[in-house]
């Protein structure tokens, strides 16, 4: 037996109850000390590599993290046991906006702002915060049991990754794929930074649609335009109509007078306008709307920006300058109404863009920003998916991926914050020459001046994350890890960052490395509450993984999440399900305790020298079923069908190994037949060993603890070989006969239950089986049948009829009879049945009355009526059973 710090040498016992807190802490520390998670680069083994989706350094483990990392760990532990050189790279993301917000809030408690500190001191303060608090989520991932190679932990702002970021930026810039320009962007007035399209979340909002009269410049009439943002009209520089719309052809030479101002703006004719929508006229605000920006470019319209970076109206807003944008909206509407320009206001539901970090309403605005020209990169990524170099699971995401990539817009990568990768670009203060370099130049390459100013913007956090699969392996250096583990094997992540992150890693990996970053992408669903609603603190339906791990144990949470991780299906999680799987963990524990009572003194070799041909049915059947469980579990994990793997193991462990096999072999284990006992011990140990290994990737702690109390010297279970099917154990005939055996046992137990025979009472059983083969099989199993059903006398006949006063059960074509004379109190049981009959008849009448009620039938929802009909069917069937029971009892008089 191996060294187990919880057990004295030679002590092959498990505690009565599984104390998971002590076990989890002890074994995780032991794994770290033994360096069980470290990757090796043995050329003789296949490699399996996976990079963790780096959680934000500000993060705290939530149930989505728990799901994602459990799935990764299941796969990593499985591949490690399959003999792969397995690398799981951990790390955290610097989370530019989120982290800066956290530290700014910290400063606010000291009555300071980042501007009081200045950029350099503020960055120092963020690094200080990261050193003090940034490891929280890493420690929580360890609590979850994650077997990452922690010696390779990375951070998106560490020096190695910073070098990779600078190298890629400069390369893309010199290739013409990064450029700087004044374009329309998504602007967050709270964070005071640009956001990429993917960082804007659209929320359905009940708003208003304002219909405004725009007078013709010559006073001859007006056109009505509609907008949800009347405050932006101050930046209008045109009204657009369709070129073929005859209603407005006369306005070409007249123009429009902009309400509330003294400005005249032109009418432009553009095919973007839909003639049938509204009045067919569209206000054009090039500085505050993406489509208007494009129209403005086509018609060379002036750009008038009417808000500053904080969402405050600026001097271009005239008398409205200084008003916050939504306050300005109210004032504008009031003034439009007062001056007769407001036609009407309609209630209007529409999607409003919000900052993904602070939920502030985003303002489209023109701004000088840095962009990546992504179309050529996207084309390479799409080609890689189409030709199968990267596969997406589940397949339902292919079309979504193609549609998004085909319509992708250039990626705004600059952010107006301080925390992040500062863009490696410099401007000469003397000659204005512009340079983009990996390292700060000593002097201007044009005039030689040493007075250089670096670009103040930082890169979008997703830029560094896009390089994660190869930057974490040492690129741009030519490392051994890069050669051995890139491309990585699979990426497991939630579907909601398919475009934030997955697509960008695809684009960068293919362009920079010449190879896809991963061969498979597995996209899992989001975790919702048991009703399918989004979890949120405000609704109080959040399941905190840290709380449930403390309550039910890490293995119970991991098994629950694995069992619920069906491909393409929403995950509805309830705490009671976690509690239910805690019972499963206890079932494993108790089964192991029972087994140890009988195998603790055995030679461990007995589990290796098994000749199935010489074994009784129980052993041949369980080995056959174990073989099937091995095959199905391996196939499920290879196909990323995590829930199917959990389902196979749950069924095998609970229903077959524990409920059937252990009960079936008790007579051998407790009996005096030495040969039967030795056979039972050998198979029991073999099945338990293999079952623990099958379970280990999902439930690592309880399996490791049990593994070390089995007979013999043992290393960690995680370095054991994952079970492979044994052809010698395949035995379909045993499976067929065992199914017959279980059906008969189930039938006899059903009679006991229905007839309310006391569990300890011995019964007589008559089995009538006409089939020659089945008859022979049941005859050979009569001893086991008697033991499992507490039967005193059992007869297996080819012909026979029901004895008087006997209860019966039909299993396929086999009749089972149990004479009830002397086993039941006829008067007492008849009284019980009569009471149940009266109650059921009353309930049946109530339900039938409902369905006969015209008012109920007219007003009740269809599903309610269907439920009542279902109840009627159930009660009628119940009454039939009661009637049969009473007739059977009457025969006993």
Regions found by a protein language model. Give the residues of each.
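Secondary-structure transition/capping motifs at alpha-helix termini
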Residues: 77-85, 106-119, 139, 143-148, ...
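Alpha-helical support elements that line or immediately flank enzyme active sites
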Residues: 65-67, 290-295, 504-512, 649
């Amino acid at each position: 037996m191996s060294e187990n710090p919880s057990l004295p040498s030679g002590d092959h016992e498990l505690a009565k109850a599984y104390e998971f807190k002590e076990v989890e802490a002890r074994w995780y520390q032991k794994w770290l000390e033994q360096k069980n998670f470290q990757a090796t680069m043995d050329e003789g083994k296949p490699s399996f590599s996976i990079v963790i989706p780096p959680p934000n350094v500000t993060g705290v483990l939530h149930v989505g993290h728990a799901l994602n990392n459990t799935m990764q760990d299941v796969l990593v532990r499985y591949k490690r046991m399959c003999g792969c050189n397995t690398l799981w790279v951990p790390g955290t993301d610097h989370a530019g906006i989120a982290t800066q917000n956290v530290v700014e809030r910290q400063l606010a408690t000291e009555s300071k702002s980042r501007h009081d500190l200045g950029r350099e001191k503020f960055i120092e303060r963020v690094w200080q915060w990261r050193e003090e608090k940034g490891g929280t989520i890493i420690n929580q991932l360890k609590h979850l049991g994650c077997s990452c190679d922690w010696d390779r932990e990375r951070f998106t702002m560490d020096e190695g990754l910073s070098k990779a970021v600078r190298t890629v930026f400069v390369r893309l810039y010199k290739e013409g794929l990064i450029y700087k320009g004044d374009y329309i962007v998504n602007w967050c007035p709270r964070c005071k930074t640009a956001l990429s399209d993917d960082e804007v979340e659209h929320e359905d909002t009940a708003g208003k649609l304002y219909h405004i009269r725009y007078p013709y410049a010559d006073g001859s009439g007006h056109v009505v335009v509609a907008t949800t943002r009347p405050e932006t009209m101050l930046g209008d520089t045109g009204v657009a109509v369709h070129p073929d719309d005859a209603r407005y052809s006369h306005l070409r030479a007249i123009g429009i007078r902009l309400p509330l101002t003294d400005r005249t703006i032109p009418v432009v004719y553009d095919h973007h306008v839909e003639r049938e929508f509204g009045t067919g006229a569209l206000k054009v605000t090039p500085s505050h709307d993406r489509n208007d920006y494009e129209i403005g470019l086509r018609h060379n319209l002036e750009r008038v920006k009417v808000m500053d970076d904080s969402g405050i109206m600026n001097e271009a807003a005239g008398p409205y300058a200084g008003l916050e944008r939504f306050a300005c909206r109210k004032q504008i509407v009031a003034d439009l109404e007062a001056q007769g320009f407001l036609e009407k206001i309609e209630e209007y539901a529409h999607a409003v863009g919000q900052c993904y970090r602070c939920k502030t309403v985003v303002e489209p605005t023109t701004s000088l920003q840095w962009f990546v020209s992504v179309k050529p990169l996207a084309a390479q990524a799409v080609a890689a998916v189409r030709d199968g170099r990267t596969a997406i699971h589940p397949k339902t995401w292919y079309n979504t991926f193609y549609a998004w990539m085909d319509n992708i817009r250039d990626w705004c990568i600059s952010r107006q914050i301080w925390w992040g990768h500062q863009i490696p670009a410099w401007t000469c203060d003397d000659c204005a020459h512009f340079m983009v370099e990996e390292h700060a130049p000593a002097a201007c390459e044009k005039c030689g001046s040493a007075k250089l100013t670096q670009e103040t913007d930082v890169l979008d956090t997703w830029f560094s994350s896009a390089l994660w699969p190869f930057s974490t392996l040492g690129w741009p250096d030519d490392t051994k890890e890069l050669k051995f583990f890139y491309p990585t094997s699979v990426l497991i992540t939630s579907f909601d960052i398919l475009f934030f992150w997955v697509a960008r890693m695809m684009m960068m990996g293919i362009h920079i490395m010449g190879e896809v970053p991963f061969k498979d992408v597995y996209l899992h669903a989001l975790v919702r509450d048991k009703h399918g609603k989004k979890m949120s603190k405000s609704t109080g339906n959040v399941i905190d993984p840290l709380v449930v791990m403390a309550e039910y144990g890490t293995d119970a949470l991991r098994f629950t999440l694995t069992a619920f991780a069906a491909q393409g299906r929403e995950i509805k999680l309830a705490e009671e399900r976690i509690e239910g799987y805690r019972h499963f963990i206890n079932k494993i524990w108790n089964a192991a305790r029972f087994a140890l009572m009988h195998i603790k003194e055995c030679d461990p070799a007995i589990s290796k020298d098994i000749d199935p041909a010489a074994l009784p049915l129980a052993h041949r059947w369980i080995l056959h079923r174990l073989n099937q469980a091995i095959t199905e579990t391996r196939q499920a994990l290879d196909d990323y069908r995590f829930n199917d793997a959990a389902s196979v193991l749950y069924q095998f462990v609970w229903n077959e190994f524990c409920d059937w096999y252990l009960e079936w072999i008790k007579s051998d284990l407790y009996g005096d037949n030495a040969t039967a006992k030795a056979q039972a011990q050998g198979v029991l140990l073999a099945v338990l060993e293999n079952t623990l290994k099958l379970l280990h990737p999902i439930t690592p702690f309880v399996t490791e603890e049990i593994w070390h109390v089995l007979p013999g010297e043992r290393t960690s279970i995680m370095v054991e070989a994952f079970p492979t099917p044994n052809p010698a154990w395949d035995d379909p005939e045993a499976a067929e006969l065992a199914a017959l055996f279980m059906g008969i046992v189930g039938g006899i137990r059903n009679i006991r239950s229905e007839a309310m025979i006391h569990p300890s009472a011995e019964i007589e059983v008559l089995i009538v089986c006409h089939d020659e083969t089945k008859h022979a099989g049941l005859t050979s199993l009569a001893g086991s049948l008697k033991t499992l059903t507490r039967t005193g006398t059992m007869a297996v006949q080819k012909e026979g009829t029901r004895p008087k006063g006997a209860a019966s059960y039909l299993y396929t074509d086999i009749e089972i009879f149990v004479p009830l004379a002397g086993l039941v109190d006829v008067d007492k049981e008849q009284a019980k049945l009569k009471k149940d009959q009266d109650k059921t008849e009353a309930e049946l009448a109530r339900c039938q009355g409902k369905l006969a009620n015209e008012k109920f039938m007219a007003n009740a929802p269809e599903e309610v009526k269907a439920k009542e009909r279902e109840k009627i069917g159930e009660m009628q069937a119940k009454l039939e059973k009661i009637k049969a029971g009473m007739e059977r009892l009457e025969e006993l008089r």
